[in-house]
């Protein structure tokens, strides 16, 4: 069953009249993971943020975005707020930017839960701890009492994921959630998303420029370049049998980097 339909989506900078995204079309079914790939500036993040109205006001959006039967572009800001978190959760690229540095992460998470649920304080704490345990965050009560600066980037990222899961959304949008992390933490966070894909009944849009990450988690893939969606299809078709020259370029570039790394590790590279 289709959960999200995006038709003829166009995003324009109203200050300059410059189109940033042009005529983008894609769908997402319930429980499916859609990978969105492209280089920086390709329009992938603003395309996905437009689903829940998180772009700056200067960006004008036209077209059609239908989420679970509702026209998202026709909603007011107050109506959109009811969807954010509860129905559509977003995991940002940098956990440090998602939390207010002046108060504890627990207080912020509790406030979000109170806005979107009718749970008591005790129920909220129990639910958050349950998902923090699920994401291997040790000593959750201590973490909830901590300020953001006291926690690592990986821990903050997993806290965002825990909060998203606690709200039981129909869709999680993950905007390059592994980019700002070290390699080991990247692996842990990616494994968490893969596990969510297996055990939770929610769709995901996973934005990344890392083809390895997308290959591990996506069911279908869309490729963006200069604000246009240039190719889409199953993970197998796009990443292993691409048709567009740009997709082929991305894959060949990644292969060259991987081959060079293998040569270096074997000691084959000389000055």
From Swiss-Prot:
One Gene Ontology term from the biological process aspect of the record: zinc ion transport
Membrane topology recorded in Swiss-Prot or TrEMBL: Peripheral membrane protein
Superkingdom of origin: Bacteria
GO cellular component, one term: plasma membrane
UniProt cross-references to InterPro entries, sorted A to Z: AAA+_ATPase (IPR003593), ABC_Ni/Peptide_Import (IPR050388), ABC_transporter-like_ATP-bd (IPR003439), ABC_transporter-like_CS (IPR017871), P-loop_NTPase (IPR027417)
Similarity comment: Belongs to the ABC transporter superfamily.
Subunit structure: The complex is composed of two ATP-binding proteins (CntD and CntF), two transmembrane proteins (CntB and CntC) and a solute-binding protein (CntA).
Protein name: Metal-staphylopine import system ATP-binding protein CntD
Native source species: Staphylococcus aureus (strain NCTC 8325 / PS 47)
Gene: cntD
